[in-house]
From Swiss-Prot:
This is Multiple organellar RNA editing factor 4, mitochondrial. Involved in organellar RNA editing. Required for the processing of few RNA editing site in mitochondria. Residues 1-64 form a transit peptide. The keyword Mitochondrion applies.
Length: 723
């Protein structure tokens, strides 16, 4: 339908490229042209263009519509008969004539162009406009139109068409022999411009329609309904009683919806992507629920069901990032008295109620905080916050890109990046402390940025570890499964939060990767962690000055007690026991997944594998590529001081890079002076390139021969004290 916008758009579209296509030879104009006062959508013309005389647009050539891409000045446009023409004029901006003066100029220009008297010209003019555009509409032939090209002040000559096809009405103020009847004011619509003023609404009212559900008038505890969708880069935020987005009740929403206190449904903000989430939360302060999405789902849909009661509050933040493929993922309920987050099971795998597992096959949808193939997460919250006390799960996140899973009694203040994994599987070498118990990873093809604090990496050709992604196989606590991943750029964070007993305080600046936190740990980790080489090999973890009892172990790979068992190969699961040859410590839940050309004894004993594992294992792929970076960096800003937790790690300035990863396989020890399983207030003994030295406190000795104590040692527990 030809709208009033046709005429306005024809004025707008005279861009330089179109001028070149439709320009004709002409002489310079005696009238000093300046940019005309056109509506907001009008493209401002260049100086060179304005100095040129009017352009006569050939309707047989012009095809482009900047609004729909389908408009053309062909006779199929209603009213475009090449007998009705719109002629716009360019008036000096610094000396703009009055409306009456403009109308007089229109009449004189029409008379001069047609070489007729002023009275005859008034009969030719059927409409004028001095507001949205400056010009007049007159009836004439194509041959007569040619005469207007060189007239002073004439800007565009365009065939006119109906703005109201049903009533066959042209736009502008109606002009009948000098008598002017104001016409309808054009208003913007999603299709262009509407000419009927009665259908127009103020911009503020339209904005409210976009951002506010129809049931805005209801009370905060009774908000139900659906609203309009907004653009992907917009947000809809509603504040109620001074509290932003605190929901006390249950809600169902699609996209990014922040409701008030009570029950509600809404789609006030929808980032492309389709999912639904439901949840319940009984909280002293409420539960913060946020759904985030990035790329749209091509096939498949994720449904999430969570029930997380907490003593003081629940934080449930989801980021639906399905990769482009097929699949479905469902989540079972996971009650927790301490705010444990339950983030999904994939493809119908069943796990005990105290477990959280991710198992993602090739091409299946990725669970929350999982970065799939090329998926990118928009940035959200930036600043860290402080939260309450006791059995309290809190979550503070910068712009995440990856997977984040949290459980109870943890405090993290992380910085930097760690464990880059390539797009087609790879070997991971976590930083020291990466193997806190009760976690497992199961990865399909590809890799992601993974936190070095948790174990059980299973990366290979889609073969999960036992208990990591197989139906009916339980994992002790948590499992991850990743699809085709994308490299994540490094970031920086601002450490901050300080929590207390049984307090999950996760303070993450702009993290980009997958992070799993487990119980009873305090971590203040900085810098970069280990990176795997392009081809297979055995690599020791970066040393972050953490507390690991026991004597030095062998040479080559030095893995500490209560940490990790490493499995490399092509994803064939193999359950094994990890036993320390010196202290006799056995692995509670470790997995030996061995592949091509790599021989690891069943008991994990020998000079090449001095491995002690408690509840974690790694399963790695063969021939993976990863950036050849080095790990073991410690940042300057300490954080994460807690009470009643099992350990407190504080790192400071990086000194010497450690754990370099090379292009080909091989056995590598931990950083200089950090071989074996050292304990605090002990000498660090090592072999080969490692040296032995004595320190009073090795909490901050990651690749450094100095003793980097925290700013205030009284604020941290002695790392050599056991809980």
């Amino acid at each position: 339908m030809a709208m009033f916008s046709h005429r306005l758009r024809r004025i707008v579209v005279a861009a330089p490229s179109y001028f070149q296509r439709f320009s004709t030879l002409s002489r310079p104009s005696d009238f000093t042209p300046v940019p005309s006062l056109l509506p907001r959508s009008v493209v401002k013309q260049s100086t060179a263009i304005n100095r040129s005389p009017a352009r006569l647009f050939s309707t047989t050539q012009y095809q482009y519509d900047p609004y729909t891409g389908e408009d053309s000045f062909m006779p199929d446009n209603e009213g475009c008969d090449f007998n009705h023409w719109l002629i716009t004029m360019n008036f000096p901006k610094d000396n703009l004539p009055s409306r009456e003066e403009m109308i007089s100029i229109f009449e004189q220009t029409c008379a001069k162009g047609l070489a007729i008297s002023l009275e005859e010209a008034k009969k030719k003019i059927y409409a004028i406009c001095t507001t949205s555009y400056q010009g007049f509409q007159a009836t004439m032939t194509i041959g007569e139109v040619e005469k207007f090209r060189d007239l002073p002040g004439v800007q565009y000559i365009i065939p006119d068409s109906y703005i109201d096809v049903e009533n066959k009405v042209y736009g502008g103020d109606k002009y009948e022999n000098g008598v002017i009847t104001p016409g309808p004011v054009p208003v913007p619509t999603k299709e262009g411009f509407d000419s009927l003023k009665k259908e127009s609404k103020p911009e503020q009212e339209e904005a409210e329609i976009i951002l506010t559900p129809p049931d805005e008038g209801k009370t905060s505890g009774q908000v139900q309904g659906q609203g309009s969708l907004t653009l992907p880069d917009q947000r809809s935020v509603k504040e109620r009683q001074g509290t932003l987005a605190l929901v006390q009740g249950q809600g169902q929403r699609s996209g990014m919806s922040i409701l008030g206190q009570g029950q509600g449904e809404g789609r006030r903000m929808s980032i492309p992507g389709q999912w639904q989430s439901r949840g319940q939360g009984n909280s002293f302060q409420g539960s913060f629920k946020q759904s985030q999405g990035t790329l749209p789902v091509r096939k498949g849909q994720t449904q999430i069901s969570d029930e997380i009661p907490s003593f003081q509050g629940n934080v449930k933040q989801r980021q639906e990032m399905p990769i482009h493929g097929q699949g479905q993922a469902q989540r079972s309920q996971m009650p927790s008295s301490q705010g444990t987050l339950r983030q999904g099971q994939a493809q119908g795998s069943q796990r005990p109620s105290n477990q959280v597992g991710y198992n993602q096959g090739q091409g299946a949808q990725t669970p929350p905080y999982h970065q799939g193939q090329g998926a990118q997460t928009p940035p959200y919250q930036e600043s860290p916050n402080n939260y309450g006390q006791g059995a309290f799960v809190q979550y503070n996140q910068g712009p995440p890109q990856g997977n984040v899973v949290q459980t109870t009694q943890e405090k993290y203040n992380q910085m930097g990046q760690g464990n880059y994994a390539p797009q087609s599987g790879g070997n991971y070498s976590p930083a020291q402390g990466a193997g806190s118990p009760r976690f497992g990873y199961g990865q399909g093809q590809g890799g992601q940025l993974l936190s070095p604090y948790r174990g059980n990496y299973n990366q290979g050709q889609g073969t999960p570890l036992p208990g990591q992604g197989q139906e009916g196989q339980p994992s002790y606590q948590m499992g991850f499964s990743q699809g085709l991943g994308a490299p994540v750029p490094p970031n920086q964070v601002i450490p901050g939060n300080y929590g207390q007993w049984a307090f999950v305080n996760y303070n993450q600046g702009p993290p980009q990767g997958n992070f799993l936190q487990g119980p009873q740990q305090n971590h203040n980790q900085g810098g970069q962690w280990n990176y795997s080489p392009q081809n297979g090999g055995h690599y020791g973890p970066a040393q972050f000055g953490q507390w690991y009892p026991g004597p030095p172990q062998g040479q080559g790979i030095q893995w500490p007690q209560y940490q990790l068992s490493y499995n490399q190969g092509q994803g064939t699961p193999f359950s094994g026991q990890c036993r320390c040859p010196n202290c006799g410590m056995t692995s509670y839940q470790g997995y030996n997944n061995q592949g091509q050309g790599t021989h690891i004894p069943e008991q994990w004993e020998g000079q090449d594998y001095a491995v002690l594992s408690y509840q974690a294992s790694y399963n790695q792929a063969h021939g993976a590529q990863a950036p050849p970076y080095h790990g073991n960096y410690n940042q300057a800003t300490p954080g994460g001081y807690g009470q009643g937790t099992s350990a407190n790690f504080n790192q400071r300035f990086p000194v010497n890079p450690a754990n370099y990863n090379m292009q080909n396989g091989g056995n590598y020890g931990p950083p200089h002076g950090l071989a074996g399983n050292p304990g605090f207030r002990q000498g660090f003994s090592g072999q080969g390139q490692n040296q032995t030295f004595q320190q009073d406190d090795q909490r901050n000795v990651a690749g450094d021969l100095r003793n980097n104590n925290p700013v205030d040692p009284t604020e941290t527990r002695k790392p050599n004290s056991r809980i």
